Amino acid sequence: CVYVVLKSYAAKERQGVVRRLTDRNYWFNRSTAKDYGLMCLNAGLRTSLWLPLIGSQLVGTLVVARALRDYFGFPEPVIWDPVTLTILYTFIYFLVDDFSRFALHAAMHRVPLLWRLHSTHHSATTLTPFTVFRVHPVESGIYFFRAFITFSLVTGVFVWLFGRHLSIIDVVGVNAIGFIANAAFANLRHSHVWVGFGRLEHYFVSPAQHQLHHSIDLCRGNYGSVLSIWDRLAGTLELSGKRRPLTFGLVSQDRIEQSSQPVISAWLSTAGDSKVA
């Protein structure tokens, strides 16, 4: 993904980006050290705690489908073409999942208690593809629970309505597509590589828009993940426009310096007195 973007840059700009990406200090500094530490800790936490605590998404799906069957009974048989059904399921799940990401992200900025958690992510003063993993463990659990709920509800409804016509391949495939799409865009959203989408930013969130979201002075919006229509409806959409110098981190200098705290301290503490963005 980064390679494709670099090919579109002018030669001079491309040299600057390559120089930045190959600079050891870009990847290894006080800010990125916290990225790597939280990435490892959250991975272990999710495996050892969140999965056993919340359960798998497929189990949640079966619980929802059975609850609908017990309450409403068996629906009238609906036979759809498998391809059409797969497209419909993928589209609806994508919309619900993307909106839930937007709503939770906006809440993380608007609700002071949640901002205390989310400010850990925004304390990064250097953005790299690993910054996406710079998340307070409690926030990581909240987002994991969000994914569990949205997947279980949407898939449970489809299983109840269409039963065996919705195959396990469709269900797993949607998760795989979502994972690949997020991985492809995340490495540009959390970087210093400026990529705007022009007029398409009214509909899709560009990496440049998310970089504005991380800047200290320029933006208090762009909460969307893939679709920017939610920001447009909420009045929080900010277009990238021309490239400009950006400063990343938190408004309060002492909060910016928290990125140099030991990872364990950051894992247990929150940025309580930082300003809600």
Segment roles from a protein language model:
Residues 1-71, 89-101:
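Specific transmembrane helices
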Residues 170, 244-277:
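A membrane-cytosol interface segment of integral membrane proteins
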Residues 15, 57, 209-211, 253, ...:
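Residue-identity detector for glutamine
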Residues 41-53, 60-65, 76-247:
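Membrane-embedded catalytic scaffold of the fatty acid hydroxylase/desaturase
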Residues 16-20, 27, 31, 78, ...:
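Coil-to-alpha-helix initiation sites in intrinsically disordered, low-complexity, charged segments
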Residues 39, 233, 266-270:
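Residues that form generic nucleotide/phosphate-binding pockets
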